[in-house]
């Protein structure tokens, strides 16, 4: 068959013949080769048949033939497809098929194009670049992206440069963004991305979207994107993304200087899980009001406690805010978004602290991303609220929550602005009891140091932040938890990079082991660490060494080595005790234990603790947790050495009394012998440490060695002390806070064994005298102990009972802390106790000075105190007061201080230093443990400055209370001294809408009182005014508006009534002057005043109370009556004499519209005639003329209008809307006003509206109780928010948003039950407001075109079934086209405007200019396609309206012919726009009118088929309403039988829709179907069943 025959058959014959020929040709192509000269004609003929779209079946068969023909030719000869004419025909058809509605057709066309590119790559790529990737159909663009991905998968060498710009331009389509991002990441993962960066920058792609694309490429973010000053991401994000590909850094690397060493940047945050901003679908907003409405809708779910009902809503809202952060709100409305986020931060924190893990995670992610994406604008205002709660979450046991909270704090710290509060929040976590916050706090400190040490170095240093960080790091490096120390070491080196001198101070205070561990993580290597060798600490070590050597020498030279054993001399009972003690304290065993000292630092700490014990004042301390505190730094070596010395110092003495005795023996008093303090047995209930069993075994072995037994003597005083304590019940034993480890059973066992031999011990007088003489003559200078790391804070008692467990370093010279001289023992134990009690008050005040200034020689004292002192003090209870970490002593009964005790202090002798060295010997003199009594004051610990401060009184210091005088406050707030005079007439007329304090003296200060602009204009200064001290009374704001505003308004016309209003008493009683004329008004004012006090009021409230009368006197009122303000009175008299004008004789409305400014100024000069003028003209026109031509009387005009609250609110709202939208007739006064005049009118009306909403109780009650009325006003104002910003700027824009917010807040106010029901039944915006009627009510209904006549279907009139044919209604198109004729035009060409539209850079003026040129264009296909593609993107209402006007111009173009494909494309676009706007918006009416215009260009059957087959079941309410209304007007009697099934399915589905409006319109559709075809009633009744009663009601049956 020839090509011309095929073309003739496909164009002329009937449909069955065409289908038959097409199928035959397809069978021929499948089996036979095609002649070379017929290939191009065949392609051309089939292409024309497919594009004609005559029949869907024929189109499908022809396209199948086309594809088979292409396959046959490619098999036959590939060169045949390389012809330029063939390439043009084939590619044109295939690209056209990419936009087909059928998915299978689009997939086939895409596959054929890919095969064609393999054969002819250059030609096909050029065709795709010129047509497909720049198409106006987003469907074609999506298929083009698929084709490009397939091509790149086939060949990575594909030249993508020509496609970069159009592909980037596709990012303006939200539905294509994911595909574009995927393609770009795939292409530029193997290519140089500089071309992509340049293209993204030139196109102006959304910054966040650009970052998401570039971050997915190898290498992270680009330098240009990071350095872009417009980016809203914080500094930390840019730094972290620049190193995203680097491996995570490990702070504990074993190789210093490695790449895993600590870094000076914030790149380590990338290794933290969930720190990066994850991918989430963005959500865009269309205006600031849209954003605020979305946030306001979340307040209900966040309001109360979490429950099963609201937790899912909270999670949904939190996720929605996260999507909004990724949308356009952050770039277009940053300040409004930040304010909205702050308003819901409490609810977000409730979600973050929830026990539900999913909700908590979402809340924490939102808080983190608010800082990462929003920057410091989102973090700084809520810092004090967010940080404490999130830091508290890090201590939870649930690891997921604690880790997420840690990541959240990290994200906030990288975004917050530096302040000292930030450091306070972080350092507070370093002192938490829980280890987790302390571990995380090290990382937070590092972030602070790296972020702010360079830029805010002086601020950190001058405001205390540096000191806090330094203390926190020093504390963390010595923390008992390994993880805290591990993280803090890394933080230390970051700190040392910026503050080397402060870091060096911390380093020098560490011990050797801590320094070694710190050097391991040094980034510059341990060899370069600033190690400062401390001063030599060999003093204690040398003492121990000399002690061991002396002990060995004594054992070698002891006479007991060769002499017979002394067991017979000392008695049998000594054998067991001496053997056990001697064996356990043998020289070899002591040497082994001494070698266990880990380092010099340990000995140094013991020595420092000994100094602390020796310099502490004598006092008893309170118990700590019912047991003695354990000092971990005490080693077994020091305990053994103390035991050794104690055993060797003990000499044979007479037995002491047991605890049961309460009388001092006379012989002990005479000999002035001291007693050893008793040992407390409040141990850990028999716990045995490691090694104690071995010590017991060695003790038992030593008991069998007679030579060892003979070399030792029992400890007399230790056993005496134990005996004294053993007689007391265990529960009554006092607990002391000591540093020594008295829980060690090893020490306790030795003392128990010595106790058994207490009664059998005897000490000859000769031995005692020898020991005393030796100690008195062998006095040497005390040893010096170098300073070391301060031990932990702990307060030993004034007399430590564990003398046997003390280190030899503690047995130094006893000195007096008051005089610094040696202290001699008292005469008796009773004298010693008296001396302690007497000296306690003197020494306690000097503890801090002595601790800091005393030399080491003076601080080395003994820890031995008289045992009787302890016995006496044990009867007293310890104090429970422990302020500031300092423990106070016991409160002992008053006792007289004996003279002998005081004399004994003057005869003090220093203790011999040899006693310390000789304490290690194992000779027979081991019984000289406690030979001398000592008064040992104990110094407080030296861990910190705060702990060294002595607390002399437990009473807390309360802050001073400042009480302000109420009268003074009233004067400050109400009566500022300003020489002003208030116009009485103006104040009387403002009474219905203003609320000010009841009586005010003198006047108001502009800053002190937040009054509206109108009132401040009414305030005038005068040289002849009242004196500053003379008050001028102002009527009470609570008195207006009254229940009868007409009566009060009548009283505002003359001075007489004004005076009566002023003289009204604030408590309801009229003043005497001229009461008869104003009695009625006074009663009304008093009634309204009482009501206003009982209801809520948003206006300012007077500072006075009824129980406290204000300062008011008759002289003040007389001053007003006598004419204090003569100007006002004269003006009132002059106005009252003006004869009233008769307005009934001429057209006042026309006069206001057409008169000259001078005539209008004269006409509006008398405010007394305003009420009559308002009865003849609309309120909007009247107020407009007053504002423009008689501005001094604006307050009067507003007062007259405010008599009707409904009229006042409606007038102000409609004028605000009209000024922005220009919806006024061309011959009215509105059209003659300039933009600046309209802006002035808008500002004046907004101020008036603000005052009405916030200060008028009547207006606020009306808005709070009548939801329908409030919703109408809010909708009226919200539709012009964006227009205000574009036309007048941010001033009116922000004020309008404030008014809308104030109205919305009133919706949450509970209605007052005493409110009249007249408020609840108030009408919609005033009937007098004709403009409001035209713009709101008329535009909320459906507009369709049938037979070229406008038909409006009003839902209330569905019952009668009649259609209204109004003749003079104002439609949307008429208003917009009139505005289009008056709007300015630009000089850009059509091509330039279309290019701006395609790049989403077009303005409203350009769109309006393009719409005005459409009637002159011959070809509107390109314009239509470009505008339709533009409408697929969300835009502000002004741009959308202008684009719809252009579509309107296209649809009303004469002789326009549209195919069904064009109709469906336009309807789909309008339906898409309709789904993103409010159904109450005028744009909804615009779309309905455009659909009505579209129906005139299509066949009803095809349109109904399209509507019923292409409807989506998950569409929004707006789409359902548009579908129902369109079907309503497409239905005809001829079409019902063919589409009965589909129509019933639609009705059955939507009549049960959750939205009541959808159900109501569906009922209207059923009524229409039954009226068109009554025979379908049975079928419909069976389908909808119970809904038929409602249908019959509407039909009037």
UniProtKB/Swiss-Prot annotation:
Major location (coarse):
cytoplasm
> Per its record, how is this protein called by name?
Protein STU1
Q: Which keywords describe this protein according to UniProt?
A: Cell cycle, Cell division, Coiled coil, Cytoplasm, Cytoskeleton, Microtubule, Mitosis, Nucleus
Q: Pfam family example for this protein?
A: CLASP_N
Record-linked InterPro entries: ARM-like, ARM-type_fold, CLASP_N_dom, TOG
Disordered: where is this region? 220-265, 519-958, 1005-1154, 1307-1332
Give me the stretches of Basic and acidic residues compositional bias.
535-552, 660-673, 694-708, 832-846, 1081-1091
Q: How does it assemble?
A: Interacts with microtubules.
SMART domains, per this entry?
TOG
Q: Where is the composition biased (Polar residues)?
A: 610-622, 632-645, 709-726, 791-801, 808-822, 918-933, 1013-1025, 1036-1045, 1122-1139
Q: Point to the regions of Acidic residues compositional bias.
A: 1108-1119
MF terms in GO: microtubule binding
| Lineage, top ranks | Eukaryota, Fungi, Dikarya, Ascomycota, Saccharomycotina
What Gene Ontology cellular component terms go with this record? Answer: cytoplasmic microtubule; microtubule organizing center; mitotic spindle; mitotic spindle midzone; nucleus; spindle microtubule
Q: Which family does it belong to?
A: Belongs to the CLASP family.
Location comes to:
Cytoplasm, Cytoskeleton; Nucleus; Cytoplasm, Cytoskeleton, Spindle
Q: Determine if Transferase is one of this entry's keywords.
A: no
Q: Where is the composition biased (Low complexity)?
A: 577-605, 765-781
Taxonomically, which superkingdom? Eukaryota
Cite the repeat ranges for HEAT: 1537-1573
- Is Cell cycle found in the keyword set? yes
Q: What does this protein do?
A: Microtubule binding protein that promotes the stabilization of dynamic microtubules. Required for mitotic spindle formation.
> Which Gene Ontology biological process is one annotated for this entry?
cell division
